[in-house]
Every structure is written in structure tokens, then in C-alpha cells.
Amino acid sequence: MAFLCETLERRVIPNWRSLSDTISNGELEYPQLENHVAFDLMEYEQEWSNNHSLLYASELVNAAVANGINDNSTAKNAAEYIVTCEGKTTDAQKSVAMSLLGSHNNEVILKSPHEIDELLMNTKDIYAKIGYYKSLIRKYPFNPINYVEAARFYVMIGQSRQAIEMMDIALALDSENRFVSRSAARLFVHVEDLDRAHYVLRKNEQVAFDPWLIASEISVNLLRDRSSSLIKNGIALINSGDFSPFSLTELTSSLGTLEFIKGTQKKSKLFFNKSLISPNDNSLAQAEWAKSNKLTLNFDREVCNKVNLSYEANALYAYQDNRFEDALKASIRWLNDMPYSKNPVFVGANIAYTFLKDYKTAAKILQRGLEANPNEPAFLNNLAYTYALDGKLIEANEIIHRINKVSEIGEKTRICLTATRGLIAYREKKIEEGRALYLEAIKAANNIADDPTYNWNAILNFIREEILATNIIPSDVETVLSQIHETPKDKGVKTLKQDILKLIAKGRTASFY
């Protein structure tokens, strides 16, 4: 049985992308914040003056943009040089340069969807990127951006310790930088150090005056089950008239989420609708999440369709609309955009194995997820489940053996793992063993009072395997199915019921063996 993705919670945690993508998304626009100490560009200016090359121009421009320095004439001169180097610059270099010159088009032209065969991470390329940023670090040891970029590539291949080491240096160099603070917070959320994620945000002296930082602080506190002391500051910024709707989108979204959790739907809708005036990909995905939890919101689809990098929101929207092929394509793009994140793996794989019965694609998505999260027990369980459904029992057992080496496994994942072992036993014609394991999983899942979907999924998987293995349709099966009252959100439960009803309609006269 797969660990369920339909019950996943979502918060407005900052998305961690490259500096150039963050700039393209408009998330580094800086108003004149109080007490802001300007970053010193002197070293970069001197290097550029002495060496008129693309490398030194890019370093100067990156440092200026990342620190909100938009009026430095030397940096603008370097940006103009980059733009004139047609055919020699990368898209990222040109994008950052144009943003400094004020001619950057904030509309990102999305690349075509990645083919699934390209999904598996090329670790050789990742190591090359790490090597590139380490060479820049040797040249510019006081530029925090290069450490942040290196950390992001480290975390893509599951090397969290090295990523944290890099991020610690970046924070030591410039803990006041929005890009550094938000990237660090996302990293520490990824490694489940929520207190550290909160600390780096609060340590930034601009947090009380910067809507992007307040949004992140409120959202991290929601993950910690704590109340934020900056809520009043955030509301004051919203009411000040000093910020554009886009600059406030994550803040209003995080406040909308807070009110939704408290049960004050009227306030929640007010904040969420403000976040949708000019959303980014994060606030749009949060609104889709709220809508899936029965909150009625004012979506302007013309506005939504123009949001840059909105793969997650597109996946959630298509999923709720039962357009599962579109949802899978968007999930794959979401995963390639943020390969360290767990949610696109859960969502994409679930769509593939539950609704499309595309087990090979599901397996590739889960394998990709395990590159960045090698010891995630839910990924391992879901991969074993996928292999078993696809008849690859040797591979399924190899994954089960790998799970046995994982020390920390949550209660819900253990229930899923017991059921998955039952599935494998059934497919190996060990019917009594499979039956016993499923009944054990059903009994354990029945104790999860706040989420009956685990119990329902265990029962439905059990019924399916009984019918497939024995060619016998239990006389009370339709009564059991009628007692499972799934909500519209429980799409996986509904699909499993439909799969069983199809078996019943066929009379189940043919075995899968």
C-alpha cells in the first residue's frame, strides 16, 4: 500500500531555486528597507575593472542583484557587457543582467516538458556544477551566493551535510540577504531542522520590514506549531500601501493559511484572494491547496496562466480536475524544477500508479526522489509497492530489504509497509502470509482516528489482492465497499473501489499469474 499524498499538508515555505530563476520570478525586488546595510561591491568592481571578461562581469552583476543594489554604475556597465556578448552567455547570465538594467521581461518562457527518460538525475552534471561553484568560491570566498548555489546542488544528490556546511558559510557572510535567508530556511526545512529554519529568518534584521521574510517566518512557525510574533507587522505592511500586490503575495497567502487552520474562513478567504491579485508560483499553489480543502476562492485563470514556474499549481489544478495525464506532466516539470522536494515525488508517482497504471513512470519518479532523499522510507515503500504492482517481485523485495536498514519510520509509513509486504506475498502466491499482513495493516490503520483513508486503502488493497489471488469474489464485498464513505478529495480511494468493481463485473475468472 502506498503512503498517501492526498493527505499532505502545505505551507508557504519559500521555494529554493537558482539566483537567476529567483530573479526571473521577481522575488528579489527590494524596497528601501529600514536599517539596511548596503553590501560592499568594491572587490567585485575592482576585479571587473582589471579583467573585462564574462566571468568577472557575471560575478559583479550577481552580487549587485542579489543584494538589491540597482544603482551601481559599474555593475550596470558590467550588465551591458554581458548583454552584448551574444552567443557566449548562458540564459541565466543574460536574465540577471537584464534585470539589473531594468529591461528584464518577468515573463519566463517555459521549456517544453521533460521526457520521462530524461527524468533520472545525471549526477555527473550535478558534480560538475558543484565543481564550478567551488571554483568561484576559491576566487570569491566572500560572495555568499556561490555557497548557496553549491548547497542547492549538494542537496539534489542527497548530500545534506555538505549542503549545510555551505549554507552555514553563506549565512556567516551575509545573514541579512533575503535570498540567503530564504534559501537557508528552505534547506533547514528539508532536513527537518525547523528550529534552525526559524532562527535564520529571525536573525535577519530586516525580517520585521520585509514581507517576503515575514511570510517565510509565519509559515515556518506553522510547521513548528508555534504562533508568530510578526503577524501584526505583516498586517501593517499589507495596509501600508508601500508594497505591490506581488511583493505581498506570499505574506497574504501565509496569513490566509493561518486563518484557514484556525477555522476563520471569512478572514482566510480575504487574505487568499489578496494573494491571488498578483500571485507567484508559491502562493498560487497554496491557493490550489486551499481550494482542494473546500475553501472557495476567486481564481482569475488568465492571471494564473501567466504565473512563472507554476508547475506545482498546474499539477494540483489538473489533478482536482481529473486531468491525470496533464497532472503527471506538470508534476514531472515540478520535480525537475525542485528536485530536492518530496511533494512532487509523492504527487507524480501517485498519479502514475493509481490513476494511469503507468508503473514504469511511477518507478522513475520515485527513483529520482531517492537521489535527493536516499533514506526516505515512504519513497522506498511506494517504490516497492510500484514494483509489486508491475510484477517485478525481485526488485520489490530488494527495496523492502533496503527499508529494513532505515532506523526511523513513522507510524503511517509502517502501516503502508506492512500492507506492501502483504501485496508482495500475495503476488508470490503466499496467500496466507499476504492475508495475515494485510489484516495486521488494517488493524493498525483503524487506530488512526484522524485519517480513515489509511484504513480504507488497506481494506481496498486487501480485497483486490484476495480476488486476484483466489478468483473468488467475497459475498459481502459490495457491503464492505458501501461502508467506505470517501470524500471528493479521496480520489485514490474512489479509484481503488472502481478497480474492484471492475473485477466484480468481470466475474474475475482469469488469474494474473
Predicted regions and their residues:
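Short coil turns that delineate tetratricopeptide repeat
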Residues: 52, 87, 141, 175, ...
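Residue at a conserved register position within TPR or TPR-like alpha-solenoid repeats
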Residues: 64-66, 120, 154, 188, ...
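Structural motif corresponding to the intra-repeat A-B loop/turn of tetratricopeptide repeats
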Residues: 67-69, 123, 157, 191, ...
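Alpha-helical segment of the N-proximal tetratricopeptide repeat
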Residues: 18-50, 59, 65-68, 110-135, ...
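Alpha-helical repeat scaffolds
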Residues: 2, 38-48, 72-85, 93, ...
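"A position-specific structural signal for the A-helix of alpha-solenoid helical repeats
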Residues: 24, 59-62, 77, 95, ...
